[in-house]
Curated annotation (Swiss-Prot):
The keyword Oxidoreductase does not apply. Signal peptide: none annotated. The gene is ZRG8. It comes from the Eukaryota. Involved in maintenance of polarized growth and daughter-cell-specific transcription. Residues 49-64, 180-194 have a biased composition (Low complexity). Residues 1-11 have a biased composition (Basic residues). Residues 103-112 have a biased composition (Basic and acidic residues). Belongs to the ZRG8 family. Residues 1-73, 97-134, 168-211, 297-366, 480-520, 856-876, 893-937, 955-990 are annotated as: Disordered. This is Zinc-regulated protein 8.
């Protein structure tokens, strides 16, 4: 009841307001009709606003009726089912319909049109009609429909048009309002004008001030139904445009910019419900080029200042001064140059706006995307916003580094190029120290007769000595460094301290060094630069003779012939310097290598040196061998040959061959074999003409210090004698007996016969050894995470083609044990015949039915009519009972089935070896032959013979299962293999 009272009061207030508004409208219409003749229908405006309603399908009348409409008033009719105001509303509406119809017919004859595209009707000024109450439709600011353009431009819907708050809209522009009752006919108070308030932007420009436009009579008498249908078609083709679209349409449309700008002008006063169109009495002034440019720049600044995104629903408005400019510009016929300039500026501005829109669109596309989740029940579910994921970064695997870089066993990096360069530099420096001059050899071999023996040898640290300082080749070497050892910190500081503290001492030392170098260079041809004690004593052996062996030269003799008055170093350093001097002598001796045949000739004079223990004990011979070498060097029978690097020999001798087939794997050596060869110094002996039996190894390679010195990169050079066989001096270079490091070959025995292969020397052509399981890799042996789990290089893994492997096995008669077993226990054998159980005798089946009838009924099967007696609840003992176990049925091997025999197969509980010969199967049964299955050799020929006698053979070993026995004839199916005894929790009875 409260809602009824409120709505009734609201409707009364609406009626009172409509009476006041209509009286004001009558006074204004009367005054305007008396003042001016009916020329412009724009003088007449409706004081009410309306909103578009749902279109109706009734076309009974040519006019539409505005009715009292408010939310409360309409809700009352819906609430009380048209019982409250039915009589009053019908009487008032019916009385009003007759008046409005007659008035509209009279006024249609006296109308004056404004434009050919508008059909305008004047309102009659009859006092009787003016005194009658007119129902009012109240509304809010609504959207206005655009006019149909002659140039087929898209229809425009202006959002929240400010004109609608002050101007009234015609009902013809909108859809006819719905009738309040089902019996009333539709009419409209605002039918006096049908197309008067079209958009000014779409109307043609006014060419003159007081020009009357005549319209044909057929347009005046056009029926309302045609207009409504046309309006419907236009509304269906309409589109809602934003502020950006309207700006772009203004620039691209054929209409001028001032025409569309007038459409957005909203400078009407709020209290004035009837805006007055001011018509200038004098001709408008001509707009100059400067004035036009200023107005255009103002418009650009105004439009650019607006935010495009935040003002999607706003309407571009112009100031009053700008509107006056554009309205004046409508009356001006500007020259052709001004039009061109205006078009060019407009096109540039529109292009700039389009580019901004495109950039915004691109940003929106790249920012995010939307997708929808679809469910089975309710179709599309709420949308899910997801962002574009960046491309994943390329992963770096360890094997990629292995291909290009070098790592040792401890994953420490080392570069072979740096090591080889270091060795080459050391080799070049030591090569310069070696001189074939006999005087030098005599001086080194017999220091007692040396002219310069009385002088103290002084060893100065040179640049090469600094190279010998420990370099960082491994990751662990970083922790061995310190600020004292680092040359970058230590050398400069010490040099500065020495200059500050004792500059005189340094000058004296430099003078002594220069004198010593001059004397040695004059006598030997080149200066011998040795390594000082302070470098090699802390970091181990640097030269390859620093192994601490007996040098056969007494240090006391050296000390006796040296003048100690010139000593400026301590006794310990002096002793170490003498040791280094003796090592320099053996540099030349150990570089000279003679041929093997000549070595046997000199072997009579000296005792051959061999290793008698497991450790490589090196013993040196007397000094007579040194004299023999000196004699050959004096005669010129011996020429020096450049020593070769170990790295070069490694690349030639132990270069990994590419694996092209399955057989190439067995030609490769393991890493341990290569390490043994490298440690024993046997690498590259074939290049110098030596065998492994007489392997020559330098003692520098078996140094207990395990130094990575220059000697590890050198192979003893060969001294060639012209016209004589090469000579090896075993008195100087000791020999070490060692066994060949290659693994011995193993013979391959066949099932029937196989000839044992003889042992051959390493490196010769020999048949390939049998494949080892550790070397033969298959695809299923490879793990998916090899990059992080394998410690060795990826190049050691080879993907073997199984066809090549099979061909190799057939060629070498290599049997594969895995072929004799099933691949999987749950796989049915390939030779299994599924029709074996169907060919059994019918008598066995009938016996099965008779014996299992009672137990079959106990498994809750109602094939027969149940009896009222107690039955056993447990199944028969031959029933299959499993508990999550998988059972494979297959025919047992080692027995034959003759035609017409009635046999079954029993479940094997334990593997029993059947004996050869015949075995009886129960009472009255026949005897069947059993294939001997305990023989050690299981050949293929026996299988072929057995197949002719219908012997059922499987791929499993025949010693696994026992021969069948017909003890349980009802169990005629194949024998099951059960993994273990299980309970009956999951038995078939449940």
């Amino acid at each position: 009841m409260r809602s009824f009272i409120k709505s009734h009061r609201k409707s009364n207030s609406l009626e009172s307001d409509s009476d006041i508004d209509f009286k004001q409208l009558k006074r204004k219409n009367a005054s305007t009709s008396q003042l001016s003749p009916p020329r412009y229908n724009t003088d007449y405006y409706d004081p009410v606003t309306s909103s578009p309603k749902t279109p109706t399908h009734s076309h009974t009348t040519s006019d539409s009726l505005p009715q009292k409409h408010s939310p409360g008033f309409e809700s009352l009719h819906r609430l009380f089912n048209n019982k409250l105001f039915k009589k009053a509303s019908n009487s008032s509406l019916n009385s009003y319909l007759a008046n409005t119809d007659s008035q509209s017919r009279r006024s249609s004859k006296d109308q004056d049109p404004l434009a050919p595209s508008f059909h305008v009707l004047k309102t009659s000024s009859n006092p009787a009609s003016q005194d009658s109450e007119l129902p009012v439709i109240k509304g809010v600011i609504t959207h206005t429909w655009g006019n149909h353009s002659k140039h087929n431009d898209p229809h425009v819907i202006v959002l929240n048009d400010p004109k609608t708050s002050f101007e009234t809209l015609r009902s013809s522009d909108l859809e006819p309002p719905p009738r309040l009752t089902s019996k009333t006919t539709r009419s409209s108070v605002s039918s006096e004008r049908s197309w008067s308030t079209r958009d000014h932007s779409m109307s043609p420009p006014l060419t003159s001030i007081n020009q009357d436009i005549d319209i044909p009579e057929d347009m005046a008498t056009r029926s309302k139904n045609t207009l409504i249908n046309k309006k419907k078609m236009e509304n269906r083709q309409a589109r809602i445009h934003s502020n950006d679209d309207l700006i772009a349409m203004r620039k691209n449309s054929s209409d001028t910019l001032p025409q569309t700008a007038e459409f957005f002008a909203s400078d009407k006063l709020p209290g004035d419900s009837t805006p007055i169109l001011e018509i200038p009495e004098s001709p408008p002034p001509v707009i100059t080029l400067e004035k036009y440019n200023s107005s255009l720049s103002d418009a650009k600044e105004l439009s650019r200042s607006k935010n495009v995104r935040s003002n999607r629903t706003s309407v571009v408005s112009m100031t009053q001064s700008e509107e006056s400019r554009w309205s004046n510009h409508l009356m001006v016929n500007s020259n052709h140059n001004q039009n061109k300039l205006r078009d060019s500026d407009d096109s540039d501005y529109s292009n700039a706006i389009d580019e901004e829109d495109d950039d915004d669109a691109d940003d929106d596309d790249e920012a995010s995307q939307f997708s929808f989740e679809y469910s089975n029940l309710s179709g599309r579910t709420p949308s899910v916003k997801y962002y574009s994921k960046p491309e994943p970064k390329q992963m770096v695997y360890i094997d990629d580094l292995y291909d290009d870089e070098d790592f040792d066993e401890d994953m420490n990096y080392y570069d072979e190029n740096e090591v080889s360069e270091f060795l080459q530099e050391e080799m070049a420096s030591n090569k310069n120290n070696i001189n074939t001059d006999t005087s030098v050899l005599k001086d080194l071999s017999s220091p007692s007769i040396n002219d310069h023996s009385n002088e103290k040898p002084i060893y100065k640290p040179t640049i090469q000595m600094r190279v010998n300082k420990p370099k960082v080749h491994r990751y662990n070497d970083l922790f061995a460094l310190s600020d004292e050892d680092d040359p970058s910190f230590n050398d400069d500081d010490e040099f500065d301290e020495d200059e500050e503290e004792g500059g005189d001492d340094n000058d004296e030392e430099d003078e002594i060094d220069e004198e010593y170098d001059q004397k040695v260079s004059d006598e030997c041809g080149q200066s011998i630069e040795l390594q000082s004690d302070d470098i090699h004593s802390d970091y181990g052996v640097e030269y390859y003779n620093d192994f601490g062996g007996d040098l056969n030269l007494q240090n006391d003799v050296q000390k006796h012939h040296i003048n100690k008055e010139q000593q400026y170093i301590s006794d310990e350093e002096f002793d170490d310097a003498i040791t280094d001097f003796n090592m320099a002598k053996h540099i030349i001796e150990e570089e000279v290598v003679l041929d093997k045949a000549e070595a046997l000739r000199y072997q009579k004079d000296a005792e051959p040196v061999q290793s008698k223990t497991s450790e490589d004990v090196v013993n040196y011979v007397d000094e007579d061998s040194n004299l023999r070498i000196n004699e050959k060097l004096e005669k010129g029978d011996v020429t020096y040959q450049k020593p070769t690097l170990l790295t070069e020999v490694k690349n030639k001798q132990f270069q990994k061959k590419p694996v092209a087939s399955f057989a190439d794997i067995f030609n490769l050596e393991s890493d341990s074999e290569e390490d043994i060869n490298n440690e024993d110094g046997l690498t590259g002996l074939s290049d110098v003409g030596l065998d492994e039996d007489d392997a020559v190894s330098s003692p520098i390679l078996q140094s207990p210090f395990e130094s990575q010195s220059l000697a590890e990169g050198l192979v003893s050079p060969v001294i060639c004698t012209p016209g004589k066989p090469n000579i090896i001096n075993k008195q100087i270079i000791p020999t070490i007996k060692c066994e060949p490091s290659s693994p011995q070959e193993k013979t391959i025995e066949n099932n029937k016969s196989h000839t044992a292969s003889n042992f051959k020397e390493y490196g010769l052509n020999h048949p390939l050894p049998p494949p080892a399981r550790s070397q033969a890799l298959k695809f299923h042996d490879l793990n998916s995470e090899l990059d992080s789990e394998l410690p060795a290089l990826m190049s050691n893994l080879y993907f073997i083609d199984e066809t090549e492997e099979d061909a190799y096995n057939e060629l070498n008669d290599v049997t594969r044990d895995e072929d004799e077993y099933l691949d999987e226990i749950n796989t049915v054998p390939e030779d299994f015949n599924f029709s074996d159980t169907e060919n059994d005798n019918n008598a066995a089946k009938r016996m099965l039915r008779r014996s299992n009838k009672g137990s079959f009924r106990s498994t809750y099967s109602f094939t027969d009519k149940p009896q009222g007696v107690t039955t056993e609840s447990s199944p028969i003992k031959n029933k299959l009972e499993v508990n999550n176990k998988t059972v494979t049925f297959f025919s047992s091997p080692g027995w034959s089935k003759s035609p017409g025999s009635e046999i079954g197969m029993q479940r094997s509980k334990s593997p029993v070896k059947p004996s050869s010969g015949y075995r009886p199967f129960g009472q009255g049964s026949k005897q069947f032959p059993i294939t001997p299955s305990h023989e050690p050799n299981y050949s293929i020929e026996e299988d072929r013979i057995a197949s002719t006698d219908e012997i059922l053979e499987s791929r499993t070993p025949p010693t696994t299962y026992m021969a069948p026995s017909p003890a349980f004839i009802p169990n005629y199916s194949l024998s099951p293999i059960q993994e273990a005894s299980s309970s009956v929790t999951n038995s078939p009875k449940r």
